[in-house]
């Protein structure tokens, strides 16, 4: 955990919830690795893994992969199903207008386009996007509060004098 200008940067090894409109804007590249980065309060959360929910706005079939475009009304993100992952897409029956939840990892194409490589895909009911949006806010509020409390505890511990004998006094 490092402290930057915006707050405490925390690298998470979990699926960080995100809206399609946040993914590309929040993508940060460190070396060859792409992270999703979100600032919430004093917490700067980062993860390669994301959970994203959106409405399928398009399906594009290519020779080596199939892309679905997920949107939330404010922006979109591409989910790329390489040939070995196409079964994930076909089994779910996703089509334009349906709502999907994708657990995946951020990647960047040779052209510099950020996309999600899916690990798991689920078709979800139409109202799920609104529920998911509310949960994102709740989760981020919780994490920011938790991090701030942890940081305050650490700061308080560091400010305490050492326990034991004071070796500075002369004998």
Curated annotation (Swiss-Prot):
It comes from the Archaea. InterPro entries: NA-bd_OB-fold, NA-bd_OB_tRNA. One of its GO terms (molecular function) is nucleic acid binding. Pfam families: tRNA_anti-codon. This is Uncharacterized 18.7 kDa protein in ribosomal RNA operon.
């Amino acid at each position: 955990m490092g402290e930057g200008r915006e707050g405490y940067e925390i690298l998470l090894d979990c699926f960080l919830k995100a809206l399609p409109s946040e993914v590309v804007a929040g993508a940060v590249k460190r070396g060859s690795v792409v992270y999703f980065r979100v600032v919430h309060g004093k917490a700067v959360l980062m993860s390669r893994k994301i959970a994203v929910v959106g409405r399928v706005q398009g399906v594009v079939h290519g020779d080596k992969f199939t892309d679905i475009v997920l949107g939330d009304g404010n922006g979109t993100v591409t989910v790329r199903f390489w040939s070995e992952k196409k079964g994930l897409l076909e089994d779910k029956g996703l089509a334009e207008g349906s709502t999907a939840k994708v657990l995946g990892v951020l990647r960047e194409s040779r052209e510099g386009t950020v996309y999600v490589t899916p690990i798991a895909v689920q078709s979800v009911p139409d109202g799920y996007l609104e529920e998911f949006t509310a949960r994102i806010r709740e989760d981020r509020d919780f994490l920011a509060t938790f991090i701030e409390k942890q940081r305050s505890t650490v700061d308080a511990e560091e400010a305490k004098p050492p326990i034991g004998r004071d070796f500075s006094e002369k004998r």
